[in-house]
C-alpha cells in the first residue's frame, strides 16, 4: 500500500521507494508530488525523515498521513489505482502500427467479411489501403454528415477499423438488420454530436447513451460502442474526443481485466485529466497508451 507524507509547509507527497545512491551508497528517499504535474523528487533518507527548526519550533520535515487525506485534493490521474506508462507523450496522433504493410490482420478479416456477405458494395474499400486510410475516410464522412442522412457506411467503416473482434453483430443472433439498428444508432450519434465540451454532465449523458445502446443492440459491447462514440465525437471535439474503452485500455489504465460501462465515466474522467496535465488531446493520448501496451505484451 502506498504511503503519503505531508511536508511541513503543507504540500503532500507519495513515497515511491527507499533506495541507495548508486555512487555514495547512502540511503535516499524517492517521492512524488501529489499536485500539479506529479514531479518526482529525491532526498537523503535522514533529511526526509529528519526534523526541521522553523520559527523556534522543531517539527518533522515530513509527517505521514492517510490515503484519504492525501488524495482529497490530488489530481485524479495521480491516484495510485490508475496507471499511465512512463513514456514521452507527444501531441501528434501516431499512425497505426505498420501502415505500409496494408491492413492489419483483424481489419483485413473484417473487410473480407463485409465484402463476402455483401454488406457493402465491391467498391466500398477502393482507395483504402491500410487502417489509417479507413480511419480518415470514416472521419471525413462524419464531418460531412447531416442528421437524417443514412449513416450505414460510416457504421461499417468504424466496424472495419475496429477489427475482427467486432464481427459478432454480423454473424450472431438473427444476423445484421440495418433497418432495426439505424434508429438506435442515430440516437447514439445525436448524443455525440450534441456534445460540445467535456464536463461531468456531458460524460454522464454519453455514458447513459452507451448503456442504452448496449442494452438494445446485442453482439457489439462497450468496447466497440466506444469506438463509435470516439469517432463521432471527433466531429465536435476534434483531437479531444473521449477515448475508446477496450480490454487493452481497461487493463493498462484501470488495471481491470473486464470492460463494462460501470467504470466508463471514471475512465473517461481520469483520461481527460491526464490529457489536460500533459497538454495534449485525448485521441493521441489513447493511441500512444494503446500502442505502448501492445508493444509490451
Predicted segments — roles?
Residues 11-14, 137-142:
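Charged, amphipathic alpha-helical segments
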Residues 205-255:
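Catalytic DNA-binding helix-loop module of base-excision-repair DNA glycosylases/AP lyases
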Residues 162-167, 224, 233, 293-294:
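Short alpha-helix boundary/capping elements
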Residues 72-137, 235-297:
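C-terminal accessory module of base-excision DNA glycosylases/AP lyases that mediates lesion recognition
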Residues 17, 157-160, 227, 251, ...:
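Residue-level signal for well-ordered alpha-helical scaffold segments within enzymatic catalytic domains
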Residues 1-71:
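Mixed-charge, low-complexity intrinsically disordered regions
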Amino acid at each position: 500500500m502506498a504511503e503519503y507524507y505531508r511536508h511541513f509547509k503543507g504540500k503532500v507527497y507519495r513515497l515511491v521507494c527507499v533506495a541507495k545512491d548508486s555512487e555514495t551508497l547512502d540511503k535516499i528517499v524517492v517521492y512524488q508530488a501529489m499536485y500539479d504535474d506529479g514531479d518526482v523528487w529525491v532526498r537523503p533518507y535522514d533529511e526526509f525523515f529528519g526534523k526541521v527548526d522553523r520559527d523556534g519550533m522543531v517539527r518533522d520535515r515530513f509527517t505521514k498521513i492517510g490515503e484519504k487525506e492525501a488524495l482529497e485534493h490530488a489530481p485524479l490521474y495521480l491516484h495510485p489505482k490508475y496507471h499511465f506508462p512512463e513514456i514521452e507523450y507527444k501531441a501528434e496522433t501516431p499512425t497505426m502500427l505498420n501502415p505500409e504493410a496494408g491492413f492489419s490482420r483483424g481489419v483485413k478479416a473484417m473487410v473480407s467479411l463485409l465484402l463476402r456477405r455483401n454488406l457493402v458494395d465491391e467498391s466500398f474499400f477502393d482507395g483504402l489501403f491500410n487502417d489509417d486510410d479507413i480511419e480518415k475516410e470514416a472521419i471525413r464522412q462524419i464531418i460531412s454528415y447531416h442528421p437524417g442522412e443514412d449513416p450505414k457506411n460510416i457504421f461499417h467503416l468504424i466496424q472495419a477499423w475496429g477489427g475482427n473482434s467486432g464481427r459478432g453483430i454480423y454473424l450472431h443472433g438473427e444476423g445484421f438488420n440495418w433497418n432495426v439498428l439505424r434508429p438506435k444508432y442515430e440516437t447514439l450519434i445525436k448524443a455525440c454530436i450534441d456534445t460540445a465540451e467535456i464536463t461531468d454532465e456531458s460524460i454522464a449523458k454519453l455514458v447513459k447513451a452507451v448503456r442504452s445502446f448496449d442494452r438494445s443492440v446485442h453482439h457489439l459491447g462497450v468496447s466497440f460502442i466506444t469506438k463509435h462514440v470516439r469517432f463521432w465525437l471527433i466531429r465536435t471535439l476534434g483531437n479531444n474526443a473521449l477515448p475508446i474503452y477496450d480490454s487493452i485500455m481497461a487493463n493498462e489504465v484501470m488495471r481491470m481485466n473486464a470492460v463494462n460501462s460501470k467504470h466508463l465515466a471514471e475512465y473517461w474522467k481520469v483520461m481527460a485529466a491526464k490529457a489536460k496535465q500533459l497538454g495534449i488531446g485525448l485521441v493521441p493520448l489513447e493511441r500512444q497508451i494503446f500502442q505502448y501496451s501492445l508493444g509490451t505484451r
